[in-house]
Amino acid sequence: MKNAVTRGQPRALAEVESMILGRAPHAVMFVGPGSTGKTTLALDLAAGLLCGDPDPGARPCRECRGCHQVASGNHPDLHRLAPDGPGDQIRIGKAGDPEPGTVRHLINELALLPVEGGARVVIVEQAHRMNDDAQNALLKMLEEPPAGVTIVLCADDEECLLPTVRSRCARVRLGPVGGREIERWLGDLGVADAPRSARLARLAGGRPGLALAYAHSSEAERIRGEIARGIVDMLAQGRAARLASVRELTKSAAALDTALDSWRSAGLAAAAAAAAGPARGRNGKATKAATASAGALTAPVPAAAEDAPPVAANAAQDAAPVAAEDASVPRLAAADRRSAASTLLEIWASIGRDISVAQAGGGPQLREVELVDELRAVAPAVSPASLVSFLARVGEISNQLDENVGPELALDVLALSWPRTEAAANAPANAPAGHRR
């Protein structure tokens, strides 16, 4: 597909190209891991459908008024929804006067005629964050779509959507992107030099959107590095120190989320500008001034349930004596705490994976490039069996976070499950902290 911003998804791009050349379905779902380019691909499709070039094979041309309006986020017939507000959800909206950014407001917008008189495109970012009421309202539009409207749902996990919604959508699947492809892409955009592009491509783990966000925020990269080092340091810590450390790491993960979110818009804007050049015109509006992202890092869910699944519940007694949090520090909203927990969990799993790779002698495959020496040094002192058990526990706790288990309890369990180096494990219980290595 010519002039596509999306990289590393040849099969998905071929399917989108066929939609532009032929007749686009009234509803299509882009499914794949977060930050693999679903929103970027949706914008490529929107640019193609709203392009004014008379030759379908040349769309998107990236030169016409329509293409520039899509790139600048100002095309009047491109409508976007994204999670917002408490719980970070997409909501149905009030029945009488629905607020912008809700499904009912979108339905009202689509009841009007198109501004440009041609196709209209709806992009629902993080569609898995729609609550059931919003999905049922959207379902009516999927069953009886307005003429000329293509609805694109971007979802990390389609199982979060109602079966009736899924059944009315064509599927396009996206997977992780190769590290070399991400590295070249960052270089082409001019957002990072060659060494940094290579480092970020490894850190991203196949997610170009995440690499792009880090490229635009050295602060986010710095915070992530501090979190990674803190996790490695915990290998030598005792129980009480771990429970204190995980609280600080969670705060850092929340700061990382903020830094990444602040730059995702700039990241996708840079990618679009590289393909489309300077944007023209400021007319038109979107259904929601959604934050443009190449994919979400995490999928936070609403406030935690009181009952914890067995894995977390069984360790609750061990995790009980946690130091009280500083009352002067504002408590994060439930959705932000859950997002921070997911972010920390992801970095923790990456560190565990790298230690396992280092134990197998696979240095070139390590993702944490800045910690190569530390990881190689600590790998022989960590039990491979305990590491395998820990990585399995990460998967269990990740699922529990999706099921509304309390993030603080889940992270306490993980901290106590994190392997200890042999020296730390063999240290006397009453040994001074400075002598426990």
Model-inferred region functions:
Residues 117-121, 146-152:
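Loop/turn-to-beta-strand initiation segments
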